[in-house]
Amino acid sequence: MLEMLERGILMSVQTMNHPPFLTGDAFRKRTQTRCRGRANSSTALQLSSDESGNYAEPCTSLLSQPNTIGVIGGVSLLSTLIFLEKLACWGSRNGKECPPFVVSSDPALSKMLSLRGPLPSARTRFDRIKLNQDLVIENLRCKRNFLQQSGARGLAMPCHLSHAWHSEISEDSSLPFLHVGDCVAMELKNAKLKPIHAAGIVRIGLLTTDSNFVASYYQERLQSQGFEVVLLDKATEEHVLVPAMEALYRKDIEGARNLLRIAIHVLLVRAVNLVLLASDDLLGVLPHNDPLLRKCIDPMDALARSTIHWAETMVKQILACLWMH
């Protein structure tokens, strides 16, 4: 588990006009330095763990600030923790105070989807998710309600798979709920990328281990901003990407790296500008100094930046209203 966390933290991405995400010891030292002087900060962390997936309603809101971020934990606890580290990094840049946040995470999702243990086949994984998706949606809606009752004023969900049900989770809620696909699309649009093939459309590659659930919403959100999303063909997915995941589960890191490099190259030769690594399993596989990572994006970086931007905008709006009155 610690090895997986380390791989996630060491993932180095260089996205558009933003500086590369800090990695390894430098990243941890910065986070520790930023947080050391903030012991009295209003940032709050609520990790609620309930095997049943039920949440006790708080008597009063934990936080009352209008820029409080609510983080809905997904299938992977490690991914949630890495996202919180991203929030801390971007939220405390230039000496700023990290916005307050409250988090809800529990082991019920992995249990519902039976994703623990040996790597299931793609078909088995798909069947398990489809069979239990109603329970998953209810679990995530309970988390949303818990966060709202705890004082969250905006929501983020650092889980690619959970975003497949973003619209269902956000029903009957008035809170702003950022979508990772929108965040990526907006950053790509602001980067003003130039097409590198004759058709004149900027192509973005997508690698995911849950293409049946994840690919459609990335295609929808990016196509709405004028991008073409390019996926692996079925043969390459079955003979390259799936074996890469199998190698990773066998702890054959070098084998997984070589296969992932092949998958990325397959997309690059199809004239994509960048490749989205839209899977927790894919992040951190390549070493942080691998030149291929300059062509890869962790979509959760875009979600973290957009979340911090929302929180900072809320503060500016309130200050503007106070100044006017």
What positions do the PLM features span?
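Non-catalytic structural scaffold of enzyme domains
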Residues: 1-325
